[in-house]
């Protein structure tokens, strides 16, 4: 019996380009959706741009355009990127739409009527220059716990403490640089604790990934809190009904964007929207998301739906991040690759296949090893799969005018291939794509071994063996057809070219039906080898792209420095004695390695040589040094006798000295030539 399903991907933020990290999720979901279509299920695949929030408002102002213009350009670019990677959305919409405004307003009113919206007056930091309340991430200052400078308003990335923005020492607006003032404002809250019982039951249903269920249990033990769903003007978003100058927080209307995109599709095609969203719906609803937004999709979103008497997701499928060559994607190394840059140089099916070969049902990071990428694509797709067709098709075309044999040369081998159909289907269903690919490639090896053992090139030279030659080559093409059917969800373009060659549609239902006695088209090249020079071209273009951006930012920074040269410096600190100073053991250290801490916006991780030993130091100077690997080999000055400090991202065994006001305005101290690691500063 056919299943009815609705599938979504997390909404890309309309404030930047799509990159290969985004593509992991969209390729994963698209493979799953295409498989379900091949199985005959009624499935709809929707997404949208997440188009609201303070960052979009500020970025638009910075560019001298309206937020509407900014998000329209982003949507055009995003749609082009997804199309380039053959992501088969039935609809791609925007959260800044009439459908989303209507549904968001309706759901808010329903939650309010059901008693799940609370209000209270809160105190917030306010930028007197920009006349706007400042979100936590738009306030910076000194950490109240460890006194680290240039920390965000909600947590310290040096000591991992959390706090209120008003606890910051010397806070400043990240928008204008002004010193914020405290103002009161009425805010609206979603009463999440009221849904704890429902959420616990949903967690125990067994349908969620174990990692998500375990994480939810931690959140339950910590205690659920009411969720602030309002923001004060100015803000780019939807206004809250009956509340002057109040807007819905972007994370309230973002998941509702799933519904809005589907509603837009329903209005255009006549689909029944309520059938998929009513509380007793018998359809299935799946969300593919990254591990960084599990909190919103496993707590707030199902609670909101339940509070509005709507159905909850059947499941939420989370995935990990993409690393390149074992480390976080890097702009300076050229591995923070935008989708549009990739598409200029490399076939999108290469990445689809590589991701599929490594994706499983767990929340694990996936490493894009560039050397392995080239080797696997060429080995599996070109040398094994496509070569299987080409080495047999030439004989069928030249000797038999494209006509296949009337019977299978090896029925047992064909039956073995068909017998794997349900196991491969189960792997696809369970999102264990790596297992599906492994099994398909095992079959591909068997198919090529069959051809090697039969050696049609030898048979072709023997008198009176035409029937045997036709039978062997037809068998090879038949096995290629089965393999391409199994790979169609992963490689839709290659499958389309294979269908043109085979003169038949590849479906799951006809896998077991051989093309006996039928004609195939003249063989044309199905797939090109992936060359290292293509990878190099992507890397170099990515480096150039971000180098140009850094140059523009550096130019602005220099102008800013020139404009502030005459500003007052910080006052001299209180006097100390020579004995106080003598307590510090300052040493010269050589940078052995330096890399960004992936989870932190501030920290660089240094490995330092002090002559007789090495130290690891975490330093909050990321904003000042965009290319940390360029620091390797430099000499720095460090406080060597500072007690080791266990931080959120590891242990720091000292402090590197720098000068400046903080943020991008920091400069490492260095020394003259001739110094050696371990020398004491006196």
From Swiss-Prot:
A motif ('KMSKS' region) lies at residues 328-332. Is required not only for elongation of protein synthesis but also for the initiation of all mRNA translation through initiator tRNA(fMet) aminoacylation. Transmembrane segments: none annotated. It is found in: Cytoplasm. Pfam families: Anticodon_3, tRNA-synt_1g, tRNA_bind. It catalyses: tRNA(Met) + L-methionine + ATP = L-methionyl-tRNA(Met) + AMP + diphosphate. Its main location: cytoplasm. This is Methionine--tRNA ligase. The gene is metG.
